């Protein structure tokens, strides 16, 4: 299975790639193809230097966002909340009809101490709802998930993920 990660060069993208490459072909996406290719090469080196090297059957490679969206069986949107409209607008017409779109997007902001959650406000739409609305011509399965997974733990393949996470199916025309 080809798992594409738009925003794949960020921390969450790295974590998903490192953990899922054991059994899948992972395609990191970036607006800058070279950045995605460099990140994928670094991730493969990290895997090969880990205790899991002999268990990895998949690969990680990089490409531009549009190519990743076009060839993925599952597409993870690992992007900031404020980029949902622009990113989905670019990819809406090229995603395969059988592709499953996954949104781990959580509204976050950053200050000198790091990232912090922006509380849900009345009238503000959830990330999953915005993804669905911004893929209007798509009859895709859209899943909102992985919101409670720590980026730091996800990137550390030696760490056990011991958190519960909820999944919400947001879909049209099934």
Regions from the language model: what does each represent?
Residues 45-57:
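N-terminal glycine-rich dinucleotide-binding loop that anchors FAD/FMN and/or NAD(P) in oxidoreductases
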Residues 80-84, 148-150, 172-173:
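Short beta->alpha connector loops
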């Amino acid at each position: 299975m080809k798992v594409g990660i738009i925003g794949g060069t960020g921390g969450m993208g790295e974590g998903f790639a490192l953990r899922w490459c054991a059994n899948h072909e992972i395609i990191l996406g970036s607006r800058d193809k070279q950045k995605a290719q460099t990140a994928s090469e670094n991730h493969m080196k990290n895997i090969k230097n880990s205790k899991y090297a002999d268990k990895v059957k998949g690969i990680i490679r990089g490409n531009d966002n549009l190519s990743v969206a076009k060839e993925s069986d599952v597409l993870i949107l690992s992007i900031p909340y404020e980029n949902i409209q622009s990113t989905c607008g670019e990819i809406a017409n090229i995603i395969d009809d059988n592709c499953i779109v996954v949104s781990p997007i959580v509204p976050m902001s950053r200050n000198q101490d790091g990232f912090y959650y922006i509380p849900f406000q009345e009238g503000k739409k959830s990330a999953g709802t915005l993804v669905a609305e911004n893929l209007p011509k798509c009859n895709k399965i859209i899943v909102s998930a992985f919101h409670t997974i720590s980026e730091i733990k996800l990137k550390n393949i030696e760490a056990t993920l011991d958190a519960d996470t909820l999944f919400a199916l947001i879909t049209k025309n099934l």
